[in-house]
Amino acid sequence: MEKKRLSKKKLVLIIVACVIISIPTIILPVSTVVVYESIFSMRFHTEEYLLFSPSEFEGLVAERSEFESNSTLTGYKYSKEGMTPKGVVVIAHGLGDGGHNKYMPYIDKFTDYGYYVFGYDAQGTDESDKKAPEGFPQSIKDLDSAIDHVQSINEYKSLPIMLFGHSFGAYSVGNVLNHHPEVECAVMVAGFNESESMLGQYPRKVLGFLVDGVLLPYVSLYERIKFGKEYSKITAVDGMEMTDAEILIVHSQNDKRVPIEYGYEIYYEEFKDDERFHFIKYEDQGHIDMLYSQNAISYRAQLENSYQAYLSEAGKRDKDKVREEYMSKNINKKLYFEPNEELFEKIINLYNSSVLE
């Protein structure tokens, strides 16, 4: 009887030991992969009613130009006839609502001021391949490949390169400087420093120190396996330290999507005394409003109110097809995306001064 009790205790101890061992070796790694892949499992496209055609902008010429990253990405070379180019602006778009098309009003203005523009759709967005972006570090690789492609184009070869990125795109702009320190100027709007800490922001609110001490090391390991050390183990701070480029960093204090402490505050603490760095901090522009004029912001609210009134009067529900039909008939896209002239002027002045130095 005593031997049976001992063998039962041994069995329990073995089971407990197996469970304890399986947590760090099986359960957490597998859970990390499943959750990570679920976060980056969606393909993003621009709604039809928001898509611009180059023909909507006087004199704007667009030429399709594909290149390879992990997959085939689609970009466009933008210019205006007869222009004498000062440089080429490469645009890295944000994540969640399609590719680079929504920046067309900015693209048009950059060409008006003498800059070629190369805009591309990152992996898993709009006209580019793959079912999903797959992870933040992939955006660095996409931008790295885009710059390599730009430098291989004959009319771009001798031109200085300027970067412009928002959110996910701003993260890739800062980080890609690790691979392209030759960039002359970089503008980063509402970006973040590194993938790992950004991915931990929401679970950190619930689990606290467990996220940094227990979960994020698995995220770091998985990203290193998936994307390689050259894209997963770098930060925007590292990149900015490697270059002599002029840098403009823009953020809003009330940004909830990319909290200011994940980007701007890190950069300000590190580079506030460096004359190469220029900082603009808004208080109430959220994650995206700083890109657009006050007229655009007011118009967006007005358009949404009109749409909600239409739903109420027609007795309809807010569905994709209903919104598409209404917006297609009523939206003024140029007003909806009208650039913030004050911010644009600061960007173009910085580009111009970088080219003249």
Residue ranges and their predicted role:
Residues 13-15, 20-67, 74-78, 304, ...:
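An N-terminal hydrophobic leader/cap segment in hydrolases
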Residues 95-108, 122, 261:
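The serine-hydrolase catalytic nucleophile loop
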Residues 242-243, 249-251, 255:
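Short beta-strand/loop motif that positions the catalytic acidic residue
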Residues 245, 259-269, 294-295:
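Short alpha-helix in the alpha/beta-hydrolase fold that links the catalytic acid
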